[in-house]
Amino acid sequence: MFDPKPVLKNLPNLPGVYRMINAQDEVIYVGKARDLKKRVSSYFQKNLPSARTRLMVSNIARIETTVTRSEAEALLLENNLIKGFMPRYNVLFRDDKSYPYIALTGDTFPRLAFHRGAQRKGSSYFGPFPNAVAVRESIQLLQKVFRLRTCENTVFANRSRPCLLHQIERCTAPCVGFISEEDYRRDVMHASLFLQGKEQQVMDELGEKMNEAAEKMEYELAAVYRDRIQSLRQVQAKQFVSDFNVSDADVIACAELEGQWCVNLVMIRGGHHLGDKSFFPKNADGADLETTMEAFLEQHYMAGAIPPLLIVGASLETAALEEVFSEQAGRRIRINTHPIGDKRVWLKMAHTNAQLALSQRIAQQANQQSRLNALREALGLPESTERIECFDISHTMGEATVASCVVFDKGAMQSSEYRRYNITGITPGDDYAAMRDVLTRRYRKVAAGEGKRPDLVFIDGGKGQLGVAVEVLNEVGLPDIQLVGIAKGEERKPGLEQMFFPEREEPVSLKKDHPGLHLLQQIRDEAHRFAITGHRAKRGKARMHSSLEDISGIGAKRRKSLLTRFGGLDGVKNASVDEIAQVDGISHALAQKIYEELH
């Protein structure tokens, strides 16, 4: 039994971070404090109100603390430690920094593009957007109104006539000189102003251009400006956040149902509602509103883009958060915990979004649980069957063989636990050898205690593949894991699957509408999808390698020049000898050799 008195006696009344550690030497909770002595002492009072906290305290074997210079510094350290240890009793949000942006590149004729990842100098970025769909819808809108190019530079540099986008009035075709650099730059400026929420300024300028064109009796040009203004008015009426006195803000609300939490984030950028995104934290059962909201703010914004205003639906101590966020952003960041008027309406909407998302998630979980129960009953599996792993092999006539392993656990597909395995050193096309290879690599580690042990393993294949799986699990010392081989039925139609068991002579079949079969199909199809996407990527890379890297005289630099100039291997294959010879470092003789090797 842990005795906290010696620890509490020596704790200072200073800001810092504390770590709760269990008997297995695992960090089970990380917290920050303005006053370490008061905060840590609060865990050892009688009659703790939270069952979650009581359970955590009962597992404490020792406590470690780190004193910091300020509460803000403690906040930074706490966030880093939570990311490193992923403690069992901290509310954890998925680390998702891959929000998409709209980019306007720094080219002579800037390109309108979808962007995710590190931002490059010279380009302008607008966002972040909650998802890729919102970005693509916005790009389509910008194409319709401002007609900017979206093609890659390699395509742009090699066009000799306008593409289809010009024909449907979604691009002004700068690639073939149908618009001057000055006029194109003006369109880019208008698009940039629009993305900043300055539609009225854009419409005023377009109105002036329309009037000028009309006075010169250039009525077709005037009609173009008129149509752009009308399109912008339609967008403004649909998307603009009226009476919202800040152009960039995030609105964040939490909802709880049946012990689960959802955080809904509504993004407003440039005065536009870009959409929302819902987050479902781990380890949040028994947590309260303030704990969940604070965990989200710390983990979501500590290393990401932050708008100047955060509107949150929880009463929090915001001073330390505002200090850290402002220092990180290089400008003042405000956190509004008691919004009024229009901001309160938006917070209510975010809360409604969170409730709806949580209800849908719980309903989906219940459906998956009923499917799992039906599968257990139909196949005679124990009630403890929770974690299912499924394997599939993908190749093209033995080329670029890839195996996949997908995981179903806790009532859902666990994509973060999916794995692909490149299969080498076997006879091409030998699926049995490929399955032996992947199962051996996977379960040798599990047997050594380096991975999670599944309750059930699906093998995409019939008796032969199942026999290989039985041999492998016996060899690695895991003979008691339940195995099931899934064979496609006659004509390979869904609903006719047969399931083979090591201990049964005859296969088991389920009716087409059986919920257990639907779960099996979902897991099997996901394994197939994951395997085939990996196979295609590996095959494409291998074919590109064999097509260019095996040609003598073509090193890395020349290969890069060729692929850049023609936009990929297909472009090189479609180029003539004279076109290939125009690439820097490629003589006419070498161009002839490249052409012959590729045809």
UniProtKB/Swiss-Prot annotation:
Cellular component aspect of the GO annotation: cytoplasm; excinuclease repair complex
Example GO molecular function: DNA binding
Keyword check for Nuclease: no
Record key words, sorted: Cytoplasm, DNA damage, DNA excision, DNA repair, Excision nuclease, SOS response
Limits of the UVR domain: 200-235
Chain segments annotated as transmembrane: none
SMART domains reported in the protein's UniProt record: GIYc
GIY-YIG domain: residues covered: 13-91
GO biological process: nucleotide-excision repair; SOS response
Subcellular location field: Cytoplasm
Lineage: superkingdom: Bacteria
Quaternary state and interactors: Interacts with UvrB in an incision complex.
Recorded family membership: Belongs to the UvrC family.
Function comment: The UvrABC repair system catalyzes the recognition and processing of DNA lesions. UvrC both incises the 5' and 3' sides of the lesion. The N-terminal half is responsible for the 3' incision and the C-terminal half is responsible for the 5' incision.
Protein name in UniProt: UvrABC system protein C
Lineage of origin: Bacteria, Pseudomonadati, Pseudomonadota, Betaproteobacteria, Nitrosomonadales
Gene giving rise to this polypeptide: uvrC
